[in-house]
A protein has these predicted regions:
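Cytosolic/nucleoplasmic/matrix-facing N-terminal domains/tails
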Residues: 1-67
Length: 67
């Protein structure tokens, strides 16, 4: 049975598939690169409050072509 990917891994894989660096994604989203890395690592301790994080994740998913 194949291991299930987490949402952070899915976002990272989609970004890499588009050939996009974290810095590029951060500039386009106007989000700090360390926050994008925290999203990909699912490190909730480094993320802003839940409402902001949810909006950032949604914007990131749209940027990399995920719904």
């Amino acid at each position: 049975m194949a291991p299930q990917l987490t949402f952070g891994a899915i976002l990272q894989e989609a970004r890499e598939h588009k050939g996009m660096e974290v810095g590029t994604a951060a500039r386009r989203l106007r989000i700090r690169p360390d926050i994008l890395r925290a999203i990909e690592a699912e490190d909730f301790s480094r993320m802003p409050p839940r409402g902001y994080t949810r909006n950032m994740i949604n914007a990131y998913a749209r940027l990399v072509g995920l719904n």
